[in-house]
């Protein structure tokens, strides 16, 4: 009887998402412009923090979240005098791969990205 209770308790626990902490190499295309930041992410519970190295002089801070296999993070980047918020929303395919969509607001443009854990 104790085994059955223990199994039922274990089965009722939520599935834990993989930890996305680490360095991720992102490759994508948004409005025909390639994007290739290297993002250093830190997951604490369901929250993501860190930074994305966009170029040699720019590594904006990121914020985001993880819910099961769904991963979202964003940062601000200036391009031709306009500040855009790039938001990455993807699915953790494995411990080393995220695939999804990136959007740039306020332009309402989007594209696809793949991130590989280094």
Summary of predicted features, one role per range:
Residues 1-4:
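Positively charged n-region of N-terminal signal peptides that target proteins for export
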Residues 11-12, 101:
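Generic alpha-helical structural signal
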Residues 13-17:
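Sec/Tat signal peptide C-region and signal peptidase I cleavage site
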Residues 18-93, 99-118:
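Central antiparallel beta-sheet cores of small beta-barrel/beta-sandwich binding domains
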